């Protein structure tokens, strides 16, 4: 019992030109933060040491959270990571981030929070701005490189993985 996978959302709004997910799973449906936290606390009490938060684009998470005073508010992914870190689970990972939505705030939290593993899956998809635009990706090669630099500046020993699509229609290089 080492790693448990916890779904935080389903669906996607991005509509990348090559992807079927928004048509099959529909728009994003976020789980309530309290349900996620409760599941992780139960996993930790059952001996699980690590959780991987899963969603098609976790950076677009926007879920309801009810505080101890019963006030309800909407929180973003970075806020959710803070709550998960407070559960006492030993290690936290997440999949997958879209470069267009990844924030420096999330990267700083990863660098500053011991339980957040310094590993990131950040799909590049293409190194060509023309192809990225044809894919309907919402970032440029330079923006991607800037994110990678920020990641390694904050976490020099971090681990970064990616996806690259080769042979996209219209690609000549």
Question: What are these regions, as identified by a protein language model?
Answer:
Residues 1-18, 41-45, 49-52:
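N-terminal pre-triad scaffold of radical SAM enzymes
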Residues 7, 31, 135, 139:
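Short, surface-exposed alpha-helical recognition segments that flank or form part
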Residues 9-10, 22, 56, 97:
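Fold-independent oxyanion-binding glycine-rich loops
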Residues 45-171:
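Conserved SAM/AdoMet-binding glycine-rich loop
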Residues 19-35, 63:
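Iron-sulfur (Fe-S) cluster-binding segments and ferredoxin-like electron-carrier domains
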């Amino acid at each position: 019992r080492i790693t448990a996978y916890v779904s935080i959302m389903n669906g996607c709004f991005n509509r990348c030109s090559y992807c079927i997910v928004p048509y099959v799973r529909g728009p994003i449906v976020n789980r309530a933060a309290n349900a996620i936290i409760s599941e992780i606390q139960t996993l930790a009490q059952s001996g699980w040491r690590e959780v991987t938060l899963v969603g098609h684009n976790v950076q677009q998470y926007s879920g309801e959270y009810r505080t101890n005073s019963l006030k309800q508010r909407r929180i973003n992914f970075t806020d959710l990571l803070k709550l998960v870190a407070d559960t006492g689970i030993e290690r936290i990972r997440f999949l997958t981030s879209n470069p267009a939505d990844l924030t420096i705030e999330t990267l700083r939290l990863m660098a500053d929070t011991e339980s957040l593993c310094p590993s990131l899956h950040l799909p590049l998809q293409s190194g060509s701005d023309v192809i990225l635009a044809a894919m309907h990706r919402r970032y440029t090669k330079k923006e991607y490189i800037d994110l990678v630099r920020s990641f390694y500046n904050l976490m020099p020993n971090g681990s970064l993985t990616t996806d690259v699509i080769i042979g996209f229609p219209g690609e000549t290089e």
